[in-house]
Amino acid sequence: MAVQQNKKSPSKRGMHRAHDFLTAPVIAIEPSTGEAHRRHHISPNGFYRGRKVVKGKDE
């Protein structure tokens, strides 16, 4: 069974956990449609940076 060799102090434990928090995804607004989407991803209706890049089923 694994046993720690030295106890980790509360300060060191906190430093180890410093980057474990969750960050919210960055949301951008499509300028042509005003729709929200994740940065560097196409919007749900197929626009990216003001241009239509993906055709829909009805197009």
UniProtKB/Swiss-Prot annotation:
| Ranges of compositional bias, category Basic residues | 49-59
Pfam family of the protein (one): Ribosomal_L32p
Q: Which domain of life is it from?
A: Bacteria
Concerning SUPFAM superfamilies, the annotation shows: Zn-binding ribosomal proteins (SSF57829)
Q: Where is this region: Disordered?
A: 1-59
Q: Which UniProt keywords apply?
A: Ribonucleoprotein, Ribosomal protein
**Would the keyword Nucleus be found if you checked this record's keyword annotation?**
no
Provide any one GO MF term from the record.
structural constituent of ribosome
Q: Name one GO cellular component term.
A: large ribosomal subunit
Q: Which residues form a coiled coil?
A: none
Q: Name one GO biological process term.
A: translation
Q: Family per UniProt?
A: Belongs to the bacterial ribosomal protein bL32 family.
Q: Which NCBIfam families match?
A: rpmF_bact
Q: Kindly provide the name given to this protein in its UniProt entry.
A: Large ribosomal subunit protein bL32
Q: What is the lineage of its organism?
A: Bacteria, Pseudomonadati, Pseudomonadota, Betaproteobacteria, Neisseriales
